[in-house]
């Protein structure tokens, strides 16, 4: 961001909720230029509308999608790094990702999983995210 490698007019945080470690975290996001669709707004407008808003703003810009698994309700994804109640369901996340199809996705990541906890179930958590984004 500081080097100008990321166009902050096309950078989103989706699904933020609950407590933060400090008020500075929210201020930093705003100062850096992130567009935030918090979980309350996401719930109100739904996953398809959230994706539509993002696609409208991103357009045909090459895109990287990063899914931080602690956006999910802890019961939906055991082994997340930051456990906090009130997250998305896996159904909502998958629907949101399917609605993002058509973006020029050139890379991505799935983060914040404690592999020691979920190693036996990794295919149940990370791999479906990729499939839901794919047009193939």
Predicted regions and their residues:
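Conserved alpha-helical scaffold segments that buttress catalytic/binding sites
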Residues: 1-136
């Amino acid at each position: 961001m500081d080097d100008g490698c990321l166009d902050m007019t096309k950078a989103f945080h989706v699904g933020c909720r609950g407590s933060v470690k400090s008020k500075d975290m929210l201020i930093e996001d705003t100062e850096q230029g992130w567009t935030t669709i918090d979980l309350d707004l996401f719930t109100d407008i739904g996953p398809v509308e959230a994706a539509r808003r993002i696609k409208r703003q991103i357009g045909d810009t090459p895109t990287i999608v990063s899914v931080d698994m602690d956006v999910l309700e802890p019961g939906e994804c055991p082994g997340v790094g930051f456990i906090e109640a009130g997250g998305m369901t896996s159904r909502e996340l998958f629907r949101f990702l399917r609605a993002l199809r058509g973006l020029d996705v050139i890379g991505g990541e799935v983060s914040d999983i404690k592999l020691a906890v979920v190693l036996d179930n990794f295919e149940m958590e990370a791999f479906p995210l990729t499939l839901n984004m794919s047009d193939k």
